[in-house]
Regions:
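A conserved catalytic-core segment of Leloir-type glycosyltransferases
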Residues: 8-76, 138, 147-154
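Conserved donor-binding/catalytic core segment of Leloir-type glycosyltransferases
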Residues: 171-192, 198, 213-214
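Nucleotide-activated donor-binding/catalytic signature segment of Leloir-type glycosyltransferases, i.e.
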Residues: 217-258
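Short alpha-helical segment that forms part of, or immediately flanks, the ligand-binding pocket
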Residues: 257, 280-284, 298-299, 305
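Aromatic "clamp/platform" in nucleotide-sugar-dependent glycosyltransferases that forms part
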Residues: 271
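Short hydrophobic beta-strand element within catalytic cores of glycosyltransferases
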Residues: 288-291, 301, 309
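Conserved acidic donor-binding segment of nucleotide-sugar-dependent glycosyltransferases
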Residues: 303-314, 322-327
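A short, well-ordered alpha-helix in the C-terminal region of glycosyltransferases
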Residues: 322, 329-343, 350-356, 360
Length: 372
């Protein structure tokens, strides 16, 4: 997922700057992942049921991880814990010498109260928290910081590709480059609203009969609902030859890159969204984005400048028609979109903000700080 993509580049960059940085991963069984998927949905506002057996599996998995990672975590000056999966680790390190920070990548603006109440028991003991947007931040008894995610322009998913590779992608997935293409890249998750995307496509196709839709996503090992959603998407697609539903392997970065470059318009019609790295990825490739009016999409998609935010399939269909019928506007929006990402959402900015945070955490109580 997006968090892993960021860390794959962020950790080596920190190491290149001389920091002794490492990235540790916890492992759990299917019950653990059912529980953490429930946490994820609950933080985003779903009314979820979490049986005691799920919570027990969650706490036991974190205990086992604490035993495995104990030496590493105790010796760290700064520990950043990402999202709910390992949030309970902190309870096993009472009196820790380093600074512990909980980093929430999820839209926590309107969480399901019982889920947040349970997680808050762990989160409130951290030294600080990071959220992606001010709207996501929760009231906590420690400093809360805002750091937006980012993309790496040198990642395989974002580098320039040769024309031959892009044309091979058209061929591989039987897409006609002479006809308009709309694309959504996301895991198969109800919050990403793939069924709403299909509805939007069908409405727009009444006016643009040549329109093609690509829904591309991968399997997330920590998302037990993905297969059911994929089945629903395939059923909704029916036998329409102009809808391509692609289940891609986790390392299909160049394929996703090529698909984004193939598309005329990229959609991210999420109902809830933490940030939406696929939005920044598409904008970096000069594609206007039609996105759900939610979460981090709002700070990336600026109406009439980098794309449009919408609240319904009808709204998305209207914007698809508008852009495809006004190619000059589509091109200008794409140019603005890339410039906006360059200024705001590249990993160099993200790294700078992390380094600033580390400095504040380690030296913020000093009245005078001498550099050098």
């Amino acid at each position: 997922g997006g968090v892993a993509e960021i860390l794959h580049k962020m950790v080596p960059l920190m190491q290149a700057l001389g920091l002794n940085a490492s990235w540790e991963v916890i492992q759990g069984d299917s019950v653990f992942y059912q529980c953490t998927k429930g946490f994820h949905n609950g933080i985003q506002g779903d009314r979820v049921e979490l049986p005691q057996s799920y919570l027990k599996a969650y706490e036991e998995t974190n205990l086992q991880a604490a035993e495995t990672l104990g030496e590493t975590l105790r010796g760290a000056d700064i520990v950043i814990i990402h999202d709910p999966q390992p949030a309970a680790l902190v309870r096993h390190f009472a009196g820790h010498k380093g600074k512990w920070v909980w980093r929430c990548h999820i839209d926590a603006s309107r969480p399901f109260r019982p889920v947040w109440k349970y997680l808050r028991e762990f989160v409130h003991t951290y030294d600080a928290s990071i959220f992606s947007l001010a709207a996501f931040a929760r009231r906590l008894p420690h400093p809360v910081y805002l750091i937006a995610p980012s993309i790496d322009p040198l990642h395989e998913k974002n580098i320039k590709l040769g024309r031959d590779e892009i044309e091979a992608t058209y061929s591989q997935f039987q897409v006609d480059p002479k006809r308009p293409i709309i694309l959504q890249v996301s895991r198969f998750d109800r919050f990403k609203d793939p069924l709403g995307v299909i509805q939007s496509y069908k409405m727009a196709k009444h006016f643009l009969p040549a329109l093609q839709l690509i829904l591309a996503g991968g399997e997330a090992s920590d998302d037990p609902e993905g297969e059911a959603v994929l089945d629903e998407v395939r059923m909704a697609s029916g036998d329409d030859p102009d809808i391509k539903v692609l289940l891609l392997p986790g390392d299909a970065h160049r394929t996703i890159n090529a698909l984004q470059r193939c598309a005329d318009i990229v959609l991210q019609k999420s109902l809830r969204e933490g940030f939406g790295l696929t939005v920044a990825e598409a904008m970096w490739k000069k594609k206007p984005v039609i996105g759900g009016d939610t979460g981090g999409i709002r700070i990336q998609v600026i109406n009439h400048h980098t794309g449009f935010t919408v609240n319904s399939p009808e709204g998305a269909a209207l914007r698809i028609r508008y852009l495809l019928q006004n190619p000059d506007i589509l091109t200008k929006m794409g140019e603005k979109a890339k410039a906006f990402v360059r200024e705001n959402f590249l990993i160099t900015r993200h790294l700078r903000e992390y380094l600033t945070l580390f400095f504040v955490l380690l030296h913020g109580d000093q009245e005078r700080i001498v550099l050098g």
